[in-house]
């Protein structure tokens, strides 16, 4: 699949990557509408979170679910969803203590374009789908 990535600090471009794999609590989504954020700019041009190589950018948007894990209860293939910038692991000790932004370590709740590929791609992975996605109502287009 194609994705728009930070190749290194100060350099971006289109790259090819494998389609993400869906875990039992996760979802694979296809973007419908995306938004660039100043965090993407700071990450790319200033290395705000350190050097990243071939890391697909983007961490906010709307999408259609194309695959769900067998333990996902609240979503199905074809659902349109809102995807937040912060997607913690809700079963982590940090999230349970109220620090979801730091689930798994400092800033580890901010996964897209930080610890894993972001949403500026043909498909992207959302961990813990039941806790990290919101259904987009049918009357909103």
Question: Model-flagged regions — what are they?
Answer:
Residues 39-45:
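Cytochrome P450 core scaffold surrounding the K-helix E-X-X-R motif
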Residues 89-141:
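NAD(P)H dinucleotide-binding glycine-rich loop of Rossmann-like/cofactor-binding domains
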Residues 10-15, 38-39:
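Short N-terminal binding/cap micro-motifs at the start of the first secondary-structure element
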Residues 20-34, 45-96, 137-139:
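Glycine-rich beta-strand-centered segment in the early N-terminal region that forms part
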Residues 8-10, 23:
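Residue-level recognition of beta-strand termini and adjacent short loop/turns
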Residues 7, 18-19, 52-58, 111-117, ...:
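Short Gly/Pro-enriched turn/cap motifs at secondary-structure boundaries
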Residues 41, 74-76, 103:
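Short, solvent-exposed secondary-structure boundary/capping segments
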Residues 1-4:
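Short structural boundary motif marking the start of a folded domain
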């Amino acid at each position: 699949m194609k994705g728009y990535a930070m190749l290194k600090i100060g350099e971006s471009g289109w790259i090819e990557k494998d389609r993400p794999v869906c875990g039992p609590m996760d979802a694979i989504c296809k973007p419908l509408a995306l938004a660039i954020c100043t965090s993407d700019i700071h990450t790319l041009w200033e290395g705000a979170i350190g050097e990243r190589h071939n890391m697909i950018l983007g961490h906010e948007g709307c999408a259609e679910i194309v695959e769900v894990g067998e333990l996902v209860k609240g979503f199905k293939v074809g659902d349109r969803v809102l995807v937040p910038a912060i997607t913690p692991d809700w079963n982590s000790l940090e999230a349970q203590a109220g620090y979801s932004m730091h689930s798994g370590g400092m800033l580890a709740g901010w996964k897209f374009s930080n610890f894993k590929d972001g949403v500026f791609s043909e498909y992207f992975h959302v961990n813990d789908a039941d806790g990290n996605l919101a259904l987009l109502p049918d009357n909103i287009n």
